[in-house]
UniProtKB/Swiss-Prot annotation:
This is Small ribosomal subunit protein uS3. It comes from the Bacteria. The keyword rRNA-binding applies. It comes from Wolbachia pipientis wMel. Keywords: Ribonucleoprotein, Ribosomal protein, RNA-binding, rRNA-binding.
Amino acid sequence: MGNVNPKGFRLKIINTWSSIWYAEKGYKQGLHQDLSIRSYINESFKHAGVSKVIIERTIDLVSVIIHSSRPGVIIGKKGSDIEKIKQKIAEKVKNNVEVNVVGVKRSEIDAVLISNSIAQQLEKRVSFRRAMKKAIQSCLRMGARGIKVSCSGRLGGAEIARTEWYKEGRLPLHTLRANIDYAFAEAKTIYGIIGVKVWVYIGN
């Protein structure tokens, strides 16, 4: 048996959904639109430090809230890029669109940003041990109470795939009130795909 996703495990306790809407009809279309919007934003702004995309819907409006460590990259000069994002999303949803960008204050303890950073370093042929240890040190320095980082695949170009992980501090996965952030990223290297998993214990 594998481990349960810490975010899904804590839904409605300390976490909430990233798509906040309900539909009796057209639920499937709405779900596909949400996936398409997130895919477009993550692909278009790979280097903008996108942490999460919250989508809220009403009858005549789709509101997209982008959490990013570098909001200026997404907004562009005088908000020019925001208008482009609105147009692209409006084409997908055929509805009025509102886009807001929120800055991530402590990117060093955001699991999504940590996993993406490690994956990007692995693609640039940085040693996986060095990338993992550097991420752990900066995370704990910023006030996280515990962190675990795991890398799986042909690490360092080895013939046989393996998993290596490092853990510092506490990580109470079965304590539901514990605020644990989790993320998964993939590094596409010349040896194959390396999976990166990150768990961050922020506190209760």
